[in-house]
Design a protein with these regions (language model features):
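Bacterial N-terminal signal peptides that target proteins for export
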Residues: 3-25
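Bacterial N-terminal signal peptides
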Residues: 23-35
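Alpha-mannosidase-like glycoside hydrolase catalytic domains involved in N-glycan trimming
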Residues: 41-137
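Polysaccharide-binding surfaces and accessory modules of carbohydrate-active proteins
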Residues: 44, 48, 67-75, 299-353
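Beta-strand-rich recognition/accessory modules
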Residues: 104-112, 340-409
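Solvent-exposed N-terminal domain segments of exported/luminal and surface proteins
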Residues: 126-232
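Extended, loop-rich substrate-binding clefts of extracytoplasmic carbohydrate-active enzymes
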Residues: 197-279
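Acidic (Asp/Glu-rich), glycine- and aromatic
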Residues: 272-274, 278, 283-316
Length: 409
């Protein structure tokens, strides 16, 4: 290497050193600025399990936010959360646990490794960019009153009164499989319309176009988490939904309430209201089903997962879990994984009967039944039956041992 080359190398090294120093200075200034603007206390979130937690939503009461951060309700809309380790913004959402009420909870979407910990600081920033939504749902009047909802990994739909008027009666939950994080509800309905107009089934959302498809057969079954009254040998279910209220449209939790008209079940008229919520990244809906009926005696209710011909079913004898490795309508579409989880406090019993995996409980009028039901796809992020069984088992453990939240200075 000659003298001129040495000088060029030294000059280049000096420039790189200056650039690194300048970037470090900028980072330090930003760090100081963020820290100096932080509100009174920080929130420490701890995973008590030796299981990785990915895309999990933590609910923090706004009463705690007011108490520990010393801010008013008028400032809630301006609050942002920062991961202190990465200095990245944590996705958040103001959420109300009561339909029509003011928000009472701050939702945080985080990931934690096994036995991991995350410290979050909070700031008020009216100029922060709007967060992109990770959940979506809407009524679909152009498709006979369907209602569909989704997140990054799965989509669902239920059927409304306009479809019932054609003679198609179903209160089961349909599954749409997808392999991309983008929303598919609008594009699938557009495909369905184009297929009908052109009489070309190649456009149908029942065909996998590289994004996903609808290949799940609901019919009059409970589909993926519908309910009914259990008589001991059969399910007596409602007709299509009659009304829906959207409670929250995101960006990290989509929630809505479904109402059903009264129906006669085992000699008794009953009505049902379901509250359904789907969090970003989760395969499972949280469903709170409440039946009302006359009298003081309890009745047996069941949440069901349809079992189609050729499906494999796993129900651990000591767990409130049912995992179905199901067969799609299109044999080339792999397998559709469906299942549900109920926590021990629900006193539910899992069994198979009437071509369903069932979660059976006893409830008096007005007593809620809470469970989780959902689906995945072998051609997306759930390639094997063992993966699905493990997912449901881990899901149950994570709900039984939630993330620990503590305020620190």
């Amino acid at each position: 290497m000659n003298h001129r080359t040495d000088l060029r190398s030294l000059a280049l090294l000096a420039q790189m050193t200056q650039s690194i120093s300048r970037n470090l200075l900028i980072l330090a200034v930003l760090l100081i600025a963020v820290q100096s603007s932080a509100l009174a206390q920080q929130l420490r979130l701890t995973n008590p399990l030796k299981i990785d937690r990915g895309d999990e939503v933590v609910d923090i009461p706004l009463a705690e936010i007011t108490q520990h951060l010393h801010i008013s309700a008028a400032q809630f809309q301006s609050i942002i959360a920062i991961n202190n380790a990465t200095m990245q913004r944590i996705p958040t959402q103001l959420f109300s646990n009561r339909e029509g009420a003011q928000p009472d909870t701050l939702l945080l979407l985080i990931r934690l490794p096994a036995n991991g910990m995350l410290d979050a600081s909070f700031h008020l920033d009216n100029s922060a960019p709007q967060q992109g939504s990770l959940v979506f749902g809407r009524a679909v009047p152009e498709r006979k009153d369907d209602f569909a909802w989704e997140n990054q990994v799965v989509a669902y739909r239920i059927y409304g009164p306009a479809l019932e008027a054609t003679g198609e009666i179903s209160s089961g939950i349909d599954v749409w499989s997808k392999r991309i994080p983008n929303f598919v509800v609008n594009s699938f309905y557009k495909q369905d319309h184009e297929a009908a107009v052109t009489h070309n089934p190649a456009f149908s959302y029942h065909k996998d176009n590289g994004i996903g498809l609808d290949s799940y057969d609901v019919g009059k079954s409970r589909g993926c988490g519908g309910t009914g009254v259990w008589t001991g040998d059969k399910l007596i279910a409602s007709r299509n939904y009659t009304a829906i209220k959207v409670i929250s449209s995101g960006p990290i939790r989509f929630a809505f309430e479904i109402s059903y008209a009264p129906w006669l079940a085992n000699g008794k008229f009953v009505t049902e209201t379901k509250r359904v919520s789907l969090d970003a990244g989760s395969h499972l809906n949280k469903i709170v089903s409440t039946y009302t009926f006359g009298g003081d005696q309890p009745i047996q209710l069941a949440a069901g997962i349809a079992i189609h011909h050729g499906a494999d079913v796993a129900i651990p004898t000591t767990e409130n879990i049912a995992a179905v490795w199901d067969t799609p309508q299109d044999a080339s579409a792999g397998r559709i994984a469906t299942g549900f989880v109920a926590l021990p406090a629900e006193h539910a019993k899992a069994l198979t009967a009437a071509n369903h995996a069932l979660m059976i409980v006893q409830r008096r009028s007005g007593e809620p039944f809470t469970y989780f039901a959902g689906a995945a796809w072998s051609k997306a992020d759930m390639p094997t039956q063992a993966d699905w069984n493990s997912y449901l088992d881990n899901f149950k453990q994570l709900r039984e041992h939630p993330i620990l939240a503590a305020w620190i200075k």
